[in-house]
Amino acid sequence: MVATSGQTTQGYVVEAYGNLLRVRFDGHVRQGEVAYVNVNDTWLKAEVIEVVGQEVKIQVFEDTQDVCRGALVTFSGHLLEAELGPGLLQGIFDGLQNRLQVLAESSFFLKRGEYVNALCKNTLWEYTPKAVVGDVLVRGDALGFVKEGYFNHKIMVPFSCFKEVTITWVISEGSYSVDTVVAKARDAEGKEYSFTMVQKWPIKQAFIQGDKVPCHEIMDVGIRILDTQIPVLKGGTFCTPGPFGAGKTVLQHHLSKYAAVDIVILCACGERAGEVVEVLQEFPHLTDPHTGESLMHRTCIICNTSSMPVAARESSIYLGITVAEYYRQMGLHVLLLADSTSRWAQALREISGRLEEIPGEEAFPAYLASRIAAFYERGGAVRMKDGSEGSLTICGAVSPAGGNFEEPVTQATLSVVGAFCGLSKARADARRYPSIDPMISWSKYLDQVGDILENKIQGWGKAVKKANYFLREGSEIGKRMEVVGEEGIPMEDMEIYLKAELYDFCYLQQNAFDAVDCYCPFDRQIELFSLMSRIFDAKFSFDCPDNARSFFLELQSKIKTLNGQKFLSEEYKEGMEVVLRLLETKMVQTA
C-alpha cells in the first residue's frame, strides 16, 4: 500500500457496482482524493468522484472481483497526482504512472494492486545548482539543472509551494538521485522547506506559472496538406476526427516522428495494443530529423489500451497533459497526441451512467462539452518570468462511430480547437493519403501563418486561398462531369478540374512510407507550392479534352517522381528542369 499523509480517514464498503463502490466514512474526504480498498490483503487504488454527506462513491482503477460489503477503505489525504522530475522521457507508463518496463520484469500481465514509482530512485543525475543562498524564489523558479537527453531539465521550486521562499542551503554540483534534497528554504513565517528533484501535482489542475501569450510560431510537421492548407501554430490546438481505417493513428505517428517540437507526449488512451507495440518497436530505431538523436530521447508514452479499466483510461489523458505542462514550464515546445479522445469520452459516459446522472445526447454526460473545453484550454504558449517561452500544442484524435461528425464528442471538440483536420473514408478508400479532406477541413491560423511567411514568399496567404478555390471548383466540376461527361463541359472548366487534380495528386498527397516523401521540409514545400501557384495562374492551349488530360497526366508523373528525389540533389534539379520545360510547351500566357 502506498503511504498516506498525516491522520488518515477510513471507511467501509456498503455497496459495489462494477468498479464503482459506495463507501461510508467517518472524518473528512475531498472530491478527487485517492483511496485504497483492501481486498484479500491487497490494496486497490481508487479515486473519490462524488461526496454525499458521510458517504462517497469511488471508482477503482483495478478489477473489483472479491470486493465484499464491509471491506476496509483508507483515504490518502491527497489528490490523484503525477510524479514529475528527471527520467520521464523514454518512459512508458500506464494511466496511473506505473512504469511498465518495471512491471514487465515480474510478469507478462499486470498484477492487481501492484504499483511502482514513476521515476527510478537509483539513477544518478549530474546536477548543476543555479540558485544561491539568499535568493528569493517563487514556484516555478529554477533551483538547478540536470542533463536529460540533449537539453537541460530544469529543477524547479515545486508548484505546491505558493509562498515566496528564501534559499538557506544549496547542494554542491555532483551526481545525485531524484529523491536527494538539493536545496532548503524558509518562508516569511519561518516555515522550513526541503526541495528534491521530484515534485507532485494533481493531474486535473492546470500546471502553469507565467503569462499566456498569443501563438506566433509555425509548427512544421513535414506534411504538405497540414503545413499549407491547415497550418497549426506552436501552442495551438487541432483535432483529427475520422472513421475506422481512415489513417488517424498513422497520421499521429507521423506527427510524433517529424513535428518540429522539443518534446512529444504520446497518450494512447484507449487504442488497440498492437499500435502501441508498433511505436515501442519503431521509435528506438528512428532518428529525429531535427536533432539526429533517437526519437525516444524526446518521447514519453502513456499507453492505456482499450482492454484496461475505463477509470484508468480517463486518468491517462490528464496524466499526459500534466507531464506536457511540466516540460512547457522549462521553456520547451511540447506536442501532446491524444489517441483517442472518444475513448476518454466513453469513459466519462460509463462513469456518469453508474453515478445515475441525467444523460445528455447519446447518453454522454451533460457536462461533456465543458470537460473537453477545459482539456484543450490547458494548451497554449506561456512566457516565463525569465523571458523564455514554452508552448503546448494539443492534437486530439476523435473516433466518431461510422464517421459521423455530428456526434457529441466531435461537435464539442470542433467548438474549441483552432484547426480541424477531417479524415475522409472516401479519400482513404481511393488511397489518397493522408486522407485529410481539404473540402471540410479548416484552420483559424491560416491568416497568421500567411503574415509570418510573407517575407519568405510574397502573397503566401492569397496563394493558399487561390489553391482552395481551385479545389472547390474542381470538386464541383468533377461532380458535373459524372453526369454529363467530359464533352458536356467547356474547356475552361476542364482545365480548372485538371489543375485541381494535379494539386491534389502531387502536393496534397504524400507517401508516409517513402524514405524521402515521408517528410517534406518547409523550404521544399515553398518551392513546390510556388510551382503549383505558377500552374494555377497559367493559361494553356488545348484543342480537345483528351490532349488536356494527357498533358496533365504526364505533368503529374514528372512531379510525383520529383517528390521522391532528395531535395536539391542533381536528380531533383534535373527533374525540376524537365517539369518547367514541359510546362512551357503548352503555356500560352501567365495571368
UniProtKB/Swiss-Prot annotation:
GO terms for molecular function: ATP binding; proton-transporting ATP synthase activity, rotational mechanism; proton-transporting ATPase activity, rotational mechanism. Its EC number is 7.1.2.2. Signal peptide: none annotated. It comes from the Bacteria. One of its GO terms (biological process) is proton motive force-driven plasma membrane ATP synthesis. Keywords: ATP synthesis, ATP-binding, Hydrogen ion transport, Ion transport, Nucleotide-binding, Translocase, Transport. ATP binds at G242, P243, F244, G245, A246, G247, K248, T249. It is an enzyme of class 7 (translocase). SUPFAM superfamilies: P-loop containing nucleoside triphosphate hydrolases (SSF52540). It catalyses: ATP + H2O + 4 H(+)(in) = ADP + phosphate + 5 H(+)(out). Pfam families: ATP-synt_ab (PF00006), ATP-synt_ab_N (PF02874), ATP-synt_ab_Xtn (PF16886), ATP-synt_VA_C (PF22919). Produces ATP from ADP in the presence of a proton gradient across the membrane. The V-type alpha chain is a catalytic subunit. Belongs to the ATPase alpha/beta chains family. This is V-type ATP synthase alpha chain.
